[in-house]
UniProtKB/Swiss-Prot annotation:
Highest taxon in the source lineage: Bacteria
Organism listed in the record: Streptococcus pneumoniae (strain Hungary19A-6)
KW Cytoplasm (keyword) present: yes
Gene Ontology terms: cellular component: cytosol
Catalytic activity annotation: tRNA(Gly) + glycine + ATP = glycyl-tRNA(Gly) + AMP + diphosphate
A Pfam family assignment: tRNA_synt_2f
Protein name: Glycine--tRNA ligase beta subunit
């Protein structure tokens, strides 16, 4: 006999961008939980709205499958003494399995007999396993979490309700100080609290309270409503996939409607209007059958059609305020002089440790000269490139880009064309930002491609030079995206430019504003984007291995595979954190990392130093990883009993030297502080 399980977590409004990933994660972790507990099922369906995450398991087995396991013990010659009695080795083996020597049998393997015992575990009822779903909810991970009401725990948002039902049976489980019940919350304004009658009645019980729990159904409702508006008004509505996904995660009961604005605003560049509608107001764009932008928009309210006219007027009023700004900036920006704006970039900080935007542009210009030759640009292309490099950031000081920063580069192209620059120069200014995402559009022109590469390379090298290097999951200056952009552009244009030779050439350049440093780190960083051979290996593990000092591809692949293999084991997180802490502190070591045993003040220092001195990574990657993880207790004991940053400089440097020697050896496998254990 099978059953149906429902788990729903009611929360404060979730950020739209975390709803879908969290729903998916809940389904995956529930499936893993059931598999781990030997519970078969027919299907898993997940649900989500801005205020809830839920999962339903149908066709769930009413009990665990029985488990039969065979365990191999010592050889017979060790298990029996000369009198044929079981030795302590045999007795200890069976005792550890919860059995007795009477359960022992002997099996022959390759000519020798060994002790074997068979252990049978009768499966528990599903009711006994269900309380474990609380651990599934606790295991969910989020980009950010928060505390509330003075509690010590944290979660993505405050939790209000927990419903766990096995068919009609209610489980009053505890989760983050919330007592489970069959009560769920309806729509914030249109609905009320309701009791979920059974696992199978979930959607209908909520539907009565103006909540569409199935995101696929909400999406289809939005699409159908938009199509209906299209047919009614004879227009074309752009259903942007990303915008649709965001909107459906902002509403529990969607109702689409069309609003309008004064046609005079259509004189403003289309990109300004589209940005105002899509990016700022979450509106869908409306066009005529020929693709021409119309003075209309589509929005989706979180509710039904009651008082919809008031809602439309409110949305129109908000949009007009945005469009007024756009119209004003478009008119006023045309009075500006490009050369004046470029000069003012001397007063705009690129980064406080790096200098001004103008200095960044000058360095980029010098890089373009080097790249133009390597890329084989024509004389005309080289001239256009030089002009574009001289002015390409000017639009950052325009009013339009100040208000709508998404339009940087786009407005630069429009303003340069109005100023009489060549189309190639104008296009390059727009294209130098490309790609803006991992799979984003690439430049089409050679001039734009070279400018994009040069701009990104100076950005990468400049930040690395002042020590602003990404670590773990932290990349505040989007250097990974910039590096990936460089690699993608080079590949797309078929330019056979050796990256190591190119970087060497760049480090040979001399600038008044900055000296490039940290070349080895830059090479590692770029190589991480070029080398995609690690496939679906988690990103942080890729980076850890590629940041190491061993550049043999076969070794890197094997190391990544070994890390993935053990990443779910219990000792992975504490072991990596121990090594990561050592890596982070070792960066503070000064000069040559030599260790003086005369400066040791405790046994833990001595133990770690000796362990590091005798550490020789050998064998396959899995064996090397075991060697490194075996150091975790020694490292932890060192940190627990040793103040690394001691006041005595000699003692401090000696302790840092121990860590430096450790990390130098460990880096031959991977830089463990690049692995995210959070």
């Amino acid at each position: 006999m099978t059953k149906n399980l429902l788990v729903e977590l009611g929360l404060e409004e979730l950020p739209a961008y975390v709803v879908t990933p969290s729903e998916k994660q809940l389904g995956e972790k529930m499936a893993a939980f059931l598999k781990e507990n030997r519970l078969s099922f027919e299907a898993i369906q997940t649900f989500s709205t801005p205020r809830r995450l839920a999962v339903r398991v149908t066709g769930l087995s009413d009990k665990q499958s029985d488990l039969t396991e065979d365990f191999k013990g010592p050889a017979k010659k060790i298990a029996l003494d000369s009198d044929g009695n079981f030795t302590k080795a045999a007795q200890g083996f069976v005792r550890g399995k919860g059995l007795t020597v009477e359960d022992i049998e002997f099996r022959e393997i390759k000519g020798e007999e060994y002790v074997y015992v068979t252990k049978e575990e009768v499966g528990q009822s599903v009711e006994a396993i269900v309380p474990g779903v609380v651990d599934v909810l606790k295991s969910l991970t989020f980009p950010v979490s928060m505390h509330w009401a003075g509690n010590s725990f944290e979660y993505i948002r405050p939790v209000h309700t927990l419903t766990v039902l096995l068919d009609e049976q209610e489980f009053d489980l505890d989760f983050l100080d919330i007592k489970g019940s069959r009560v769920s919350r309806g729509h914030r304004f249109l609905g009320k609290e309701t009791k979920i009658q059974s696992a199978l009645s979930y959607e209908e019980d909520l539907r009565k309270q103006f909540v569409i729990a199935d995101p696929c159904e909400r999406e289809q409702m939005i699409v159908d409503q938009i199509k209906e508006i299209e047919a009614k008004h004879g227009v074309r509505i752009e259903i942007d996939a990303d915008l649709l996904n965001e909107v459906l995660n902002l509403v529990e009961y969607p109702t689409a409607f069309m609003g309008s604005f004064d046609a005079k605003y259509l004189e403003v560049p289309e990109e300004v209007l589209v940005t105002s509608m899509k990016e700022h107001q979450r509106y869908f764009v409306v066009r005529d059958q020929d693709g021409k932008l119309l003075p209309n928009f589509i929005s989706v309210r979180n509710g039904n059609a009651e008082r919809l006219k008031n809602v439309i007027k409110g949305n129109e009023k908000v949009l007009v305020a945005r469009l007024e700004d756009g119209e004003f900036f478009w008119r006023e920006d045309q009075k500006l002089v490009i050369s004046d704006l470029v000069e003012k970039l001397n007063n705009v900080t690129f980064h406080e440790k790096i200098g001004s935007l103008r200095e960044h542009m000058i360095r980029t210009g010098q890089i373009t000269v080097l790249l133009a030759e390597k890329a084989g640009l024509s004389v005309d292309e080289t001239v256009d490139l030089a002009r574009a490099a001289a002015i390409y950031k000017f639009d950052l000081l325009t009013g339009m880009v100040g208000e709508f920063d998404e339009l940087q580069g786009i407005m630069g192209e429009k303003y340069t064309l109005l100023a009489g620059e060549t189309p190639a120069v104008a296009a390059a200014i727009r294209e130098h930002y490309m790609p803006t995402s991992a799979e984003g559009e690439l430049p089409e022109s050679k001039v734009g491609a070279v400018l994009a590469i040069a701009d990104k390379l100076d950005t990468i090298l400049s930040f690395f030079s002042v020590g602003l290097i990404p670590s773990g999951s932290n990349d505040p200056y989007a250097l990974r995206r910039a590096t990936q952009g460089v690699v993608r552009i080079l590949d797309a244009f078929g330019w056979h430019i050796a990256m190591d030779e190119l970087i060497d050439s760049l480090y040979a350049l001399k600038f008044d504003s900055l000296t490039y440093e940290n070349k080895a780190e830059v090479m590692d960083f770029i190589k991480a984007r070029v080398d995609k051979m690690m496939g679906s290996t988690p990103k942080d593990i890729k980076e850890a291995v590629l940041a190491g000092s061993n550049f043999v591809v076969a070794d890197m692949l094997e190391a990544a595979s070994a890390l993935v293999e053990v990443s779910k084991e219990e000792d992975f997180k504490p072991s990596v954190e121990s090594l990561s802490r050592a890596f982070n502190l070792a960066e503070k070591a000064e000069g040559v990392a030599t260790v003086d045993s005369a400066l040791f003040e405790n046994d833990q220092e001595k133990a770690l130093a000796e362990a590091v001195e005798t550490l020789i990574l050998s064998g396959p990657a899995s064996q090397q990883l075991k060697q490194l993880f075996a150091l975790s207790p020694v490292i932890d004991a060192f940190f627990e009993n040793t103040m690394v940053m001691a006041e005595d400089q000699a003692v401090r440097q000696n302790r840092l030297a121990i860590l430096s020697q450790l990390t130098k050896k460990a880096a031959k496998f991977a830089c463990f502080n690049q692995i995210n254990t959070k």
